[in-house]
A protein has these predicted regions:
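Carbohydrate-associated surface elements
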Residues: 149, 169
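A short, well-ordered alpha-helix in the C-terminal region of glycosyltransferases
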Residues: 335-349
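Nucleotide-sugar-dependent
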Residues: 201, 256-261, 268-287, 297-305
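Acidic anion/phosphate-binding donor-loop and adjacent secondary structure
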Residues: 36, 170-187, 202, 370
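N-terminal subdomain of nucleotide-sugar transferases
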Residues: 1-48, 142, 213, 376
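Conserved acidic donor-binding segment of nucleotide-sugar-dependent glycosyltransferases
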Residues: 312-320, 328-333
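Membrane-proximal helix-turn-helix segments that form the acceptor-binding/catalytic region
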Residues: 124-145, 157
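Nucleotide-activated donor-binding/catalytic signature segment of Leloir-type glycosyltransferases, i.e.
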Residues: 232-259, 267
């Protein structure tokens, strides 16, 4: 198929370091690798990561009316039979273009965007935002979501909309090549977090748990890689616990450098805070698994499914249980090895090729048969 993939969110720059940017690059490249002709249209090209290997990349203009015209021109110029859009608060231009040209639109939904914006970003017109969202979903041909919680959410907003759950993926070759080394020449056990520093990621709680663990485990070290709005509070938590000499705060790391960071670790943590609607399918967790790292995680949302038998789970927001899981892995090299091997095996189910195949199935379901030529 000829596919147009659209991302109108300026906060997700194509070459950016955060997970959303990595997802845009990797799913678009995976669809191209599957045999489709993929045009990628994004609002921002900024960042330091390399562009994905797709047929063509276009930067969208700012005014939404101009974007709709630009999207329509791209559909016509490249004979696109379907549009896949990463749903955002700024969505709408692709819907207008698709309606005018009678081309099916499939939304890729990675979060309940309107509710998230009201909760964390000060969105004031909640009811208007939800009404607009419902209109966009009802006009779409289908939706692809990354978690079961999101499937429930989208189906509640638009009951007639076909919804497929497709978890995020991981570049198996890149991360498995950088599996943890056992020949570092020291006995330090490195516990790591790699990802955006956002309030709901719970990195401050990880620092608190590490502080308790460090009192009785002199061999442990904490490695934190990432940037975001919570970075200042994370640094403050480290200073308050007098842990500056035992915590490495690396700041923002390019995505192509993440495997090398993971290769220095012995175990990894996804310390999410409890929420009523945990909708994440974290790239970081899948990358931890592919790198052969045991994962410590809260038993919430789809995380038990994503981690499988490759980690230790604890009740969300239970700091003592988090400390216990960390301590158990720190003190048992055999357990770390067994869970690490299970992690690599389990990660094979989440390669981007499989993700692209599942997304393709949804796209093919909404495209007339005569338009589906070219898909592998």
């Amino acid at each position: 198929m000829n596919i147009l993939y659209v991302c109108t969110d300026k906060g997700i720059p194509l070459r950016g370091a955060k997970g959303a940017s990595a997802h845009v690059r990797q799913i678009s490249a995976a669809l191209q690798a599957k045999g489709h002709d993929l045009t990628l249209a994004v609002r921002s090209m900024s960042g330091a990561n390399p562009d994905p290997a797709v047929a063509r990349i276009v930067e969208l203009s700012a005014p939404q009316h101009d974007q709709a015209t630009q999207v329509a021109d791209l559909i016509n110029a490249h004979k696109c039979s379907v549009v896949l859009e990463r749903y955002a608060l700024t969505s709408g231009s692709a819907a207008a273009a698709c309606a005018a040209l009678h081309v099916p639109l499939v939304y890729e939904v990675n979060a309940p965007i309107v509710l998230e914006a009201a909760r964390y970003r000060g969105l004031e017109e909640l009811e208007a935002g939800l009404a607009r969202e419902q209109g966009l979903f009802n006009a779409a041909a289908a939706a692809v979501v990354v978690s079961s919680a999101l499937s429930h959410y989208v189906s509640t907003v638009a009951p007639a909309l076909p919804v497929a759950v497709v978890s995020n993926g991981v570049d198996l070759a890149r991360f498995t090549r950088c599996m943890p080394r056992t020949d570092r020449g020291d006995r330090t056990i490195r516990i790591g977090f790699v990802g955006s520093m956002k309030p709901w990621h719970g990195v401050e709680e990880l620092v608190t748990a590490f502080a308790e663990l460090a009192l009785r485990e002199p061999s442990v070290r904490l490695v934190l890689a990432g940037h975001g709005p919570s970075l200042a509070s994370v640094r403050a938590a480290v200073d308050l616990a007098h842990l500056a000499d035992r915590v490495d705060i690396l700041g923002e790391v390019r995505h192509d450098q993440v495997p090398s960071v993971l290769a220095t670790l012995d175990l990894a943590v996804a310390p999410y805070r409890a929420t009523e609607d945990f909708y994440f399918s974290p790239l970081k967790v899948l990358e931890y698994l592919a790198a052969g790292l045991p994962v410590v995680y809260p038993k919430i949302g789809d995380l038990p499914f994503l981690v499988g038998q490759a980690g230790l789970g604890y009740p969300p927001d239970d700091g003592s249980a988090l400390v216990a899981c960390l301590g158990r892995l720190v003190g048992d090299a055999g357990l770390r090895a067994r869970l690490g091997a299970a992690a690599v095996e389990h990660a094979q189910s989440f390669g981007w090729a499989g993700v692209a195949a599942r997304v393709t199935a949804t796209l093919e379901n909404v495209v007339p048969v005569r338009s589906c030529g070219g898909a592998a």
